[in-house]
Amino acid sequence: MRKSFYSWLMTQRNPKSNEPVAILADYAFDETTFPKHSSDFETVSRYLEDEASFSFNLTDFDDIWEDYLNH
């Protein structure tokens, strides 16, 4: 069973990095309502589009999701 996107994303945290995956990881870490148990693209994508308290480039998110699927 695949670990949740959030769990994988937390392995990418690096506050000193300017890489989009590290930036998203830091944002998600601070976001109490992030869908932490989801491994569903639509759930996470809709959250980022409609509910997140931060703004993030969704093209970068698509690339990050591909990395998640390929890990």
Curated annotation (Swiss-Prot):
InterPro entries documented for this protein: UPF0346, YozE_SAM-like, YozE_SAM-like_sf
Coiled-coil stretches noted in the UniProt entry, renumbered to this chain: none
Organism superkingdom: Bacteria
Signal peptide start and end residues: none
NCBIfam families associated with the record: PRK13672.1
Entry similarity comment: Belongs to the UPF0346 family.
Protein name: UPF0346 protein SAG1509
Organism: Streptococcus agalactiae serotype V (strain ATCC BAA-611 / 2603 V/R)
